[in-house]
Amino acid sequence: MKSRNGPLRVGIGGPVGSGKTALTEKLCKAMRDNYSVAVVTNDIYTTEDAEALVRMQALPSDRIVGVETGGCPHTAIREDATINLQAIAGLNQRIPDLDVVFIESGGDNLAATFSPDLADITIYVISVCQGEEIPRKGGPGITRSDLLVINKKDLAPYVGADLEVMDRDATRMRASRPFVFSDMKRGDGVSSIVSFLREQGGL
């Protein structure tokens, strides 16, 4: 699909340690054989996430760009997305046939949102390790993202999180918006997320 911005732009946000980079890796590996894919990662002072994706062999290195946002990471995806838009423009110039660009935000809080000028579809990632109460705490990431991913479901028994409670709270907080439980270590939930992107993104 070519959106009004060119390739479909998928924003991936969430707190530090929720599994954003693991999700980005799994999506790249699941989609790269059928689509032309690239990634822009955001870190405050380094390009660590971009380097990690290269090490994971998610994509060739020329399809992964890391940007250093400085300051608050949410600014670079919402108030002033210039640095990300420039990175995407560079990818488009280098790889004209791009179908999808994943934009991975730096670790942020529950109030983080993507500018509509930057992302066509938004995915927000939380972890059961942050506590079963996270879905009911709300915030734009929980309530307004196009897809909520509740990651690390395999660790629920070890951190005292009740998945049924999280399911109930996510259903209530998100109304009709979809969410999925995942375990990125084993790849559980990835196929559902890819299907969502195909359907909602017109891929």
From Swiss-Prot:
Pfam families in alphabetical order: cobW
GO biological process: urea catabolic process
Keywords of this entry: Chaperone, Cytoplasm, GTP-binding, Nickel insertion, Nucleotide-binding
Chief place of localization: cytoplasm
Binding site for GTP: 14-21
GO MF, one annotated term: nickel cation binding
GO CC annotations, alphabetized: cytoplasm
UniProt KW Oxidoreductase keyword: no
Keyword Lipid biosynthesis: no
UniProt subcellular location: Cytoplasm
PANTHER family in the record: UREASE ACCESSORY PROTEIN G
NCBIfam families per UniProt: ureG
Protein family per UniProt: Belongs to the SIMIBI class G3E GTPase family. UreG subfamily.
Known partners and oligomeric status: Homodimer. UreD, UreF and UreG form a complex that acts as a GTP-hydrolysis-dependent molecular chaperone, activating the urease apoprotein by helping to assemble the nickel containing metallocenter of UreC. The UreE protein probably delivers the nickel.
HAMAP family: UreG (MF_01389)
Role description: Facilitates the functional incorporation of the urease nickel metallocenter. This process requires GTP hydrolysis, probably effectuated by UreG.
The protein's name: Urease accessory protein UreG
Gene from which the chain derives: ureG
